[in-house]
């Protein structure tokens, strides 16, 4: 019995250490967002620098065509015009490949880039790489709002998919209002 308990304890410790090893800290609010260059569902390359001067909603999600990820993506899709009115671009990121993203974007009629981070470098740089069941590496469901100067303006951690886009939109409106100079007549 004690041997089973000891083996279980060791196995749990290894899983915890393994999960911790994959973890990297997310960039803090106010610091420069980590640079990236990734392909979208059409094969087009996107770099963070391409969006300098615009607000960027960079959302990480675990897996294409899963219930929560589909809900999250479709809510961003349904609010796309509100984001565009604020001059914001939406970029989704997961560790799935370009082909998986292509099928997902087509099936859900997504009007924004879904970036393939198959090498998991960007997901790790943003501190969202996590291990599911201690084995499979996926992106944690986090969202970053990046300001027009390329700094992290807000970070949502381990979000619930339902209603998340509305929360991001509210935060983005508040941030944009603070940085837009008031006009007087």
Give the label of every model feature segment.
Residues 1-9:
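Bacterial N-terminal signal peptides that target proteins for export
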Residues 27, 36-55:
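A short beta-strand-turn-helix
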Residues 49-70:
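Short active-site neighborhood of thiol/selenol oxidoreductases, capturing the structured segment around
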Residues 14-35, 180-183:
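N-proximal helix/coil linker or "cap" segments that precede and/or mark the start of modular domains
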Residues 138-185:
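Thiol-/selenol-based redox modules, centered on thioredoxin-like
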Residues 65-110, 118-122:
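Structural microenvironment flanking redox-active thiols in thiol-disulfide oxidoreductases
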């Amino acid at each position: 019995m004690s041997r089973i308990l000891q083996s279980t304890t060791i196995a749990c410790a290894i899983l915890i250490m393994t999960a911790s090893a994959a973890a990297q800290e997310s960039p803090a609010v106010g610091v420069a967002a980590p640079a990236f260059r990734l392909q979208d569902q059409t094969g087009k390359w996107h770099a963070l620098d391409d969006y300098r001067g615009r607000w960027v909603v960079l959302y990480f999600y675990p897996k294409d065509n899963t219930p929560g990820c589909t809900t999250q993506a479709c809510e961003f899709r349904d609010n796309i015009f509100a984001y565009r009115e604020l001059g914001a671009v939406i970029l989704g990121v997961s560790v799935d490949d370009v082909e998986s993203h292509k099928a997902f974007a087509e099936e859900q009629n997504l009007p924004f880039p879904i970036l393939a981070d198959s090498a998991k470098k960007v997901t790790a740089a943003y501190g969202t790489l996590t291990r599911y069941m201690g084995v499979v590496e996926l992106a944690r469901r986090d969202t970053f709002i990046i300001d027009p100067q390329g700094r992290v303006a807000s970070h949502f951690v381990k979000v619930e998919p339902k209603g998340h886009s509305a929360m991001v939109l509210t935060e983005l409106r508040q941030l944009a209002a603070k940085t837009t100079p008031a006009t007087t007549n």
